[in-house]
C-alpha cells in the first residue's frame, strides 16, 4: 500500500458523447475562415507565422509590463489598492441598494405597508406603489439540440469553475507553505536571541510587535528608553532590528594622551562595526555598545561641569584634564568611520595608559549602575514634595585622584632618589622604603550582615574610589633617626586634593612636635632638607677622629644634644661662638666641632694653637651637598697669616654617582673632616667633586 495519498482537485476530463457531424464542422470553418476557395498553402503558412509573431509580441509585452510593475513604488500600489477597495465597496453598496429597491417595489403590490418601510424616499416619490408585478410563466419547451447545448455550456462552466477553484487552492497552499516557512524562520531567530540572553518583550506602543531590550535599566530615562528596538519580520521571515527614525551611526569614547600638540597614546575602538547584516546578535551588541558609549560621554560631561576648578576643561565635544605635570588626557566621542592615525609610531606605554583610562571610565559607569540598582531595591525614603536631586557619577574624580597621587608619588620618589645619590657620593648612608598606593578602608554604614552581602567586585571598586595613600619611610644618617611621609589624596568633591603628613623621630631631638601637615609638596621638601641638614650638623663632630680626647668630644656632643641645643646661648662669648675647653690646648691643633647655629647648618671649632675659631657651613640641596670652611677674623691685632681667611669649599653632587667613577676615588665627608682638622689644611680654595 502506498504511503502517500493524493487527492486531485481538478475534475476528470470526460469525452463528448458523440462528435459533431461533418455539416456542423463545415459550417464552423466557413464562419471562421471563409470559403474553401480562399484557403491555400501559402495563406496557411502566412497565418501560422503571424500567429507566432503575435505570440512573441504578447510575451515581450507581458515581460515589459511585469518589469514596469515591479518598478512601481510601494506607496503608489498601496494608494491604488485602497482606491480599488473603496470603489468595490461603493459598487457593492449601490448594487445592494438597487436590489433592495427592486424587491421592495415588487413586494409593494402584495404587502404595501411592509414594503414601504424598506423603500427609499426617492423611490416612493418617483414610482407609485404596486406598479411592478411578477407572474409565473411556463418556460418554452426546448429541443433536443438546445438541451444538448445547454448541458455542454453548463458542463464547460463547471469545469472552468472547478479549474479556477483548484488553482486558487494550490496558490493558497503554496502561500501558506511560504508563510509557515517565514514564521518558522522568524520565531527560530527570536528563540536564538532569547537563548543568547537578550530580553525579548512587547513594545509599549505596539503590543502586537515584539522587541528586544539591549539597554540598561539603571541608566537615566533618556538612554533607558532608547535601549528598546522592534523585531520586525522582513522578506522570507528574516528578522530586522528596527531602532526607530533617530538612528545614529555607532560611536565610541576615544581617549588620547598628549604632550602639547603631540599625541603620545590613543585607544582603539571599543566596539566593532558589523558589516554582515545577517548577524543579528552582532548588530544588537553594536547597538548596545554604542548606546553605552553615548551615555558614558554624557555622564562625563555632567561631571566635568562641577570639576572645572580642578583643571578639567570642556571644549565643545571634547574633555581635557591633566595626567601629570606634562601630559594631558583628551576625551571625545567619535564615529567608527573616522580616520585614526597610525598607532604604530606611538608610545606603547602611553597607549596602555589611554586604554586603562578608557576601561576605568566604563567600569566606573557600570559601578554607578550597580549603585542605582541597590538604591532602587532598598526601602524607599519617605515621600516629600521636593524633587530628589540626581548627583553626578564619580567617574572622572577617581582618575583625577589617581593621577594627582601618582604625580606626587613620582615627584617624591625622584626627590629621594636624587638626595640619596647626593649623600652616597659623600660616603653617607641613606635608605628609604616606598609603600605605594595603600588604600585606606572606608567605613560602611549598616550592620555586619549588610557588609557581608557586598560582593568582591564591589569591594575592589571601593578601593578605587576611596582616598589613595602612599607612605615613604626614610632613615636619616644618624642611627635611630627616621621620618615618614604620608601622601593622602581624597576623592570627596568638597575636599579633592592631596595632603602631606610628616612624622619624625630624631635622636638629637627626642621631644620634637609631630606630625606636620602640609598642602604643598615643596614645603615638605624644604622640611626634609632641613631635617637632613640638622642631622648632618650633629653628625659632623662624630666623624672627626683624633682631633681631641674622647672625653672632650663626648662632652661637646652631649652638650648640644636634645633640647639644650637651643637654650645655651648665654655661654657664648661676645663673638657669638662657644668658648673652647682649656684642656690640652697646647697639644691640640683644633678642638671638636660644636653646632653653633644648627638651624642654619653652621658649626665652629676653636684652635688653641692659633687662638682662632674656624667656621663650617653645611648647605644641602637635593642634587648637591656643599661644605664651606673658613677662619673667623680675629678682633685683636692681626698678623699677616690672619689676613688670609683660608677658605675651602667641598662639593658632592648626585651626578657624580652616574659618572662611573669609583667610590674610592672620591673623598668622603669623613675624610674631608679629618683634613680640616690637620695643621696644614690652610691651602687654596678647592672644589672636591667637580671635574
UniProtKB/Swiss-Prot annotation:
Main location: nucleus
GO biological process terms held by the UniProt record: regulation of transcription by RNA polymerase II
GO molecular function: transcription coregulator activity
UniProt-listed Pfam families: Med17 (PF10156)
Keyword Disulfide bond belongs to the record: no
Coiled coil found in the keyword field: yes
Record key words, sorted: Activator, Coiled coil, Nucleus, Transcription, Transcription regulation
Family as reported in the entry's similarity comment: Belongs to the Mediator complex subunit 17 family.
Quaternary structure note: Component of the Mediator complex.
Function: Component of the Mediator complex, a coactivator involved in the regulated transcription of nearly all RNA polymerase II-dependent genes. Mediator functions as a bridge to convey information from gene-specific regulatory proteins to the basal RNA polymerase II transcription machinery. Mediator is recruited to promoters by direct interactions with regulatory proteins and serves as a scaffold for the assembly of a functional preinitiation complex with RNA polymerase II and the general transcription factors.
Name of the protein in question: Mediator of RNA polymerase II transcription subunit 17
Originating species: Coccidioides immitis (strain RS)
Taxonomic lineage: Eukaryota, Fungi, Dikarya, Ascomycota, Pezizomycotina
Gene name linked to the record: SRB4
Amino acid at each position: 500500500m502506498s504511503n502517500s495519498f493524493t487527492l486531485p482537485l481538478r475534475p476528470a476530463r470526460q469525452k463528448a458523447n458523440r462528435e459533431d457531424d461533418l455539416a456542423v464542422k463545415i459550417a464552423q470553418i466557413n464562419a471562421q475562415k471563409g470559403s474553401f476557395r480562399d484557403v491555400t498553402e501559402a495563406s496557411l503558412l502566412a497565418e501560422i507565422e503571424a500567429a507566432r509573431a503575435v505570440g512573441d509580441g504578447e510575451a515581450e509585452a507581458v515581460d515589459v509590463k511585469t518589469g514596469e510593475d515591479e518598478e512601481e513604488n510601494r506607496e503608489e500600489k498601496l494608494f491604488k489598492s485602497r482606491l480599488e477597495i473603496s470603489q468595490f465597496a461603493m459598487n457593492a453598496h449601490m448594487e445592494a441598494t438597487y436590489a433592495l429597491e427592486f424587491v421592495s417595489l415588487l413586494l409593494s403590490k402584495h404587502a404595501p405597508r411592509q414594503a414601504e418601510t424598506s423603500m427609499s424616499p426617492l423611490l416612493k416619490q418617483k414610482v407609485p406603489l404596486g406598479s411592478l408585478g411578477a407572474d409565473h410563466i411556463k418556460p418554452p419547451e426546448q429541443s433536443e439540440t438546445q438541451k444538448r447545448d445547454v448541458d455542454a455550456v453548463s458542463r464547460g462552466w463547471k469545469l472552468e469553475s472547478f479549474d479556477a477553484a483548484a488553482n486558487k487552492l494550490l496558490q493558497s497552499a503554496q502561500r501558506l507553505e511560504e508563510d509557515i516557512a517565514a514564521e518558522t524562520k522568524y520565531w527560530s531567530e527570536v528563540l536564538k536571541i532569547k537563548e543568547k540572553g537578550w530580553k525579548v518583550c512587547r513594545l509599549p506602543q505596539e503590543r502586537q510587535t515584539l522587541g528586544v531590550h539591549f539597554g540598561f535599566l539603571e541608566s537615566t530615562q533618556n538612554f533607558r528608553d532608547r535601549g528598546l528596538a522592534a523585531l520586525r519580520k522582513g522578506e522570507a521571515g528574516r528578522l530586522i532590528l528596527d531602532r526607530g527614525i533617530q538612528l545614529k551611526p555607532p560611536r565610541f569614547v576615544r581617549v588620547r594622551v598628549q604632550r602639547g600638540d603631540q599625541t603620545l597614546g590613543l585607544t582603539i575602538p571599543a566596539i566593532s562595526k558589523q558589516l554582515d547584516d545577517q548577524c543579528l546578535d552582532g548588530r544588537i551588541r553594536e547597538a548596545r555598545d554604542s548606546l553605552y558609549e553615548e551615555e558614558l560621554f554624557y555622564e562625563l560631561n555632567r561631571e566635568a561641569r562641577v570639576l572645572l576648578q580642578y583643571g578639567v576643561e570642556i571644549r565643545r565635544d571634547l574633555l581635557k584634564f591633566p595626567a601629570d605635570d606634562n601630559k594631558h588626557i583628551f576625551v571625545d566621542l567619535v564615529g567608527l568611520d573616522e580616520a585614526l592615525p597610525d598607532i604604530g609610531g606611538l608610545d606603547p606605554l602611553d597607549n596602555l595608559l589611554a586604554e586603562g583610562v578608557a576601561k576605568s571610565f566604563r567600569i566606573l559607569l557600570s559601578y554607578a549602575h550597580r549603585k542605582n540598582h541597590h538604591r532602587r531595591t532598598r526601602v524607599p525614603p519617605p515621600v516629600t514634595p521636593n524633587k530628589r536631586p540626581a548627583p553626578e557619577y564619580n567617574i572622572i574624580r577617581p582618575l583625577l585622584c589617581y593621577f594627582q597621587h601618582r604625580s606626587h608619588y613620582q615627584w617624591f620618589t625622584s626627590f629621594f632618589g636624587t638626595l640619596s645619590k647626593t649623600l652616597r657620593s659623600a660616603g653617607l648612608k641613606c635608605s628609604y622604603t616606598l609603600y605605594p598606593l595603600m588604600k585606606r578602608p572606608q567605613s560602611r554604614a549598616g550592620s555586619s550582615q549588610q557588609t557581608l552581602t557586598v560582593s568582591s567586585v564591589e569591594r575592589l571598586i571601593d578601593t578605587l574610589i576611596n582616598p589613595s595613600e602612599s607612605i615613604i619611610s626614610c632613615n636619616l644618617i644618624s642611627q635611630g633617626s627616621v621620618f615618614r611621609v604620608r601622601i593622602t589624596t581624597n576623592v570627596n568633591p568638597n575636599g579633592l586634593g592631596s595632603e602631606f603628613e610628616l612624622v619624625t623621630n630624631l635622636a638629637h631631638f627626642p621631644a620634637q612636635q609631630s606630625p606636620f601637615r602640609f598642602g604643598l609638596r615643596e614645603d615638605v621638601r624644604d622640611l626634609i632638607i632641613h631635617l637632613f641638614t640638622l642631622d648632618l650638623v650633629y653628625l659632623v663632630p662624630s666623624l672627626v677622629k683624633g682631633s681631641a680626647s674622647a672625653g672632650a668630644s663626648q662632652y661637646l656632643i652631649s652638650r648640644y644634644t636634645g633640647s639644650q641645643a637651643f637654650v645655651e646661648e648665654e655661654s657664648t662669648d661676645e663673638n657669638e661662638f662657644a668658648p673652647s675647653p682649656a684642656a690640652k690646648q697646647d697639644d691640640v691643633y683644633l678642638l671638636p666641632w660644636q653646632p653653633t647655629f644648627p638651624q642654619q647648618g653652621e658649626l665652629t671649632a676653636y684652635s688653641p694653637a692659633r687662638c682662632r675659631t674656624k667656621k663650617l657651613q653645611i648647605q644641602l640641596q637635593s642634587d648637591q651637598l656643599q661644605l664651606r670652611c673658613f677662619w673667623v677674623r680675629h678682633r685683636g691685632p692681626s698678623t699677616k697669616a690672619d689676613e688670609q681667611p683660608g677658605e675651602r669649599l667641598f662639593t658632592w653632587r648626585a651626578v657624580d654617582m652616574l659618572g662611573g667613577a669609583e667610590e674610592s676615588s672620591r673623598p668622603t665627608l669623613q675624610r674631608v673632616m679629618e683634613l680640616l682638622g690637620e695643621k696644614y689644611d690652610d691651602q687654596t680654595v678647592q672644589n672636591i667633586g667637580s671635574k
